[in-house]
From Swiss-Prot:
The lineage of its organism: Bacteria, Bacillati, Bacillota, Bacilli, Bacillales. Keywords: Coiled coil, Ligase. It holds the Pfam family Rossmann-like_BshC. This is Putative cysteine ligase BshC. Its EC number is 6.-.-.-. InterPro entries: Bacillithiol_biosynth_BshC, CC_BshC, Rossmann-like_BshC.
């Protein structure tokens, strides 16, 4: 594997944050400097965490996932007051979801290792599985290439329930068939059988979406020391009850903090991402198997426009009795993470970084400082045949990332013809229409009754010219079919659906192509934190 860095244009908060713009950096409590990380360690030492209870839960949970010895030792290390975490999170996508989930985990592992060495304290990697998520449409699919098209392949569970990812039971046979259909779209390789077995081993041990995700990730990173946590695990929810109570008692201050910080963001010229009602409580409650967002209504906590209503005392009582019924929204999830873990750094994608910039005053309302927010590592893989296609078309590796591939294709095609087809036909139509306009005027003067027919005649002539143009373009494309197919392959591989590769393709394709140790080989690489995009030639 050969790794290169390229500068890819970014926009908005992420671009300004990485470029060191002071205005946006002031929306975060720590710069990404070594001194700032040292200060973060000192700040965390002044706080108390329920470490032993957390260790007990994480040992049980990660052991159930058949964690490696390095993970078990890292969990135990969390009981020490001088141990901290680097953390990231994601929904429990089937087959682990898009590649960026894997890249987030690699980011967590690398930063934890780097900071442990530079700060001289124990730093462990943690990945937070968003088990409370009820939106199955976000996690129940993957993309494949089929019949020279990119196809979204959805897993249709025959017994769907309106439950969280932690509670939604998987129909194992249905899921197994879905996985087999996906692998049929991959080339048969020496690794296919082993990868299918690898996936099926995880599936057989799983009852829910989160189980399947957790087992797959743990098997993939079994020797890395990665700690997994299911954010909606009933035992974890019990530990979170005191903080849920705190949120309920301070929800007005939380909403005010969010509003004030969003005003700051607006003044800096950015558009806020988080949308909430002014009476939001920022907590979900599970009612009749549905995740209901609570709102304030004249001192009562209501859901679904008043369909459900609770007094403060009733809500607190229910939290103590059934904590697993409660979960956080986009505003309070980072707060809960901060409450549970001694977080040295949070790693997020571009969208997460943008919405965290809106939370600074929310953190302060609770008495927290926002942890250092580190943009995750971004990666694109270039297979050998794609590298050959780029070379044959005289394209640089950076070109598909800096330009629209369709535009590159059009430019290349135009260069194969002495005079651009579009320009020549525009000129021809203009000349012909000028002549025809004069001709119509002549016809109208002699016989006004033929005016309508003359107009139709103009339309027909235009239609025939456009048909000729289309036929010419089609024949030119057929003549250069080999080269144009190379552009299509480049687009599918590097910019599928016009998006970054890591937002569309799944890691199983690469495991099938390069073996079960593919992720291990990627982890051996050293990635920089300078905001540049990493291109790995395979």
């Amino acid at each position: 594997m050969e790794i290169k860095e390229i500068s890819v244009p970014q926009q908005g908060v992420v671009a300004d944050y990485m470029n060191g713009k002071k205005e946006i950096q002031s929306c975060f409590d720590y710069m990404l400097t070594e001194d700032a990380f040292k200060q973060r360690v000192q700040d965390l030492r002044e706080r108390e965490f329920f470490r032993q209870d957390l260790v007990t839960h994480l040992l049980e949970y990660n052991t159930k996932l058949q964690a490696g010895e390095a993970t078990i030792q890292n969990v135990k290390a969390l009981g020490d007051e001088n141990t901290y975490v680097v953390i990231a999170g994601q929904q429990a996508g089937l087959l682990t979801g898009p590649l960026y989930t894997i890249h987030k985990i690699i980011s967590v592992l690398q930063l934890a290792k780097e900071k442990e060495e530079s700060l001289g304290v124990k730093v462990v990697p943690v990945f937070w599985i968003a088990g409370e998520d009820h939106d199955m449409d976000e996690i129940n699919h993957t993309f494949v290439t089929k019949n020279k098209k990119i196809k979204k392949t959805i897993f249709h569970d025959r017994n769907p329930k309106k439950a969280s990812a932690s509670e939604s039971e998987l129909s194992l046979e249905d899921c197994r068939k879905w996985i087999e259909e996906i692998f049929k779209t991959y080339p048969e390789t020496n690794f296919t059988k082993d990868v299918l077995q690898f996936v099926d081993d995880s599936l057989r041990k799983s009852n829910t979406y989160v189980d399947f995700f957790g087992h797959l990730i743990m098997k993939m990173f079994v020797n890395s020391g990665l700690i997994l946590v299911d954010s909606h695990h009933p035992e974890l929810r019990k530990l979170e009850v005191p903080f849920f109570k705190q949120i309920v008692s301070k929800y007005k201050e939380v909403q005010e903090g969010l509003h004030n910080q969003q005003e700051v963001i607006k003044e800096l010229g950015y558009k806020p991402i988080i949308e909430t009602k002014s009476n939001a409580v920022h907590i979900f409650m599970e009612i009749d198997n549905e995740r209901v967002l609570l709102e304030d209504n004249q001192g009562k906590f209501v859901g679904k426009d008043g369909t459900y209503s609770f007094s403060y005392e009733e809500l607190i009582e229910e939290m103590e009795r059934s904590p697993e019924r409660f979960s956080n929204n986009v505003v309070t999830r980072p707060l809960m993470q901060e409450y549970v873990f001694p977080t040295l750094a949070f790693i997020g994608g571009p969208g997460e970084l943008a919405y965290w910039s809106e939370l600074q005053q929310v953190f302060h309302t609770i008495g927290f400082r926002m942890p250092p927010v580190v943009p995750r590592i971004t990666i694109t893989y270039i297979e050998r045949d794609i590298a050959t296609d780029l070379h044959d078309l005289q394209l640089q590796e950076r070109d598909p990332f800096l330009n629209n591939v369709d535009k590159l294709r059009e430019n290349w095609l135009s260069n194969q013809i002495e005079e651009p087809i579009d320009d020549r036909f525009v000129e021809a139509k203009k000349e012909i229409m000028n002549i025809h306009t004069s001709l119509q005027q002549f016809v109208k003067e002699i016989d006004p009754g033929l005016s309508a027919f003359a107009g139709k005649n103009e339309f027909k002539i235009n239609e025939q010219i456009e048909l000729l143009e289309r036929m010419l373009k089609r024949n030119v494309e057929k003549k250069h079919e080999v080269e144009l197919n190379k552009f299509r392959r480049i687009q599918f591989a590097l910019r599928p659906l016009g998006a970054p590769q890591e937002r569309v393709w799944n890691v199983c394709y690469y495991l099938n192509q390069f073996g079960l140790d593919f992720v291990d080989h990627v982890m051996e690489k050293t990635f920089s934190w300078n905001g540049k995009h990493h291109v790995i030639k395979l």
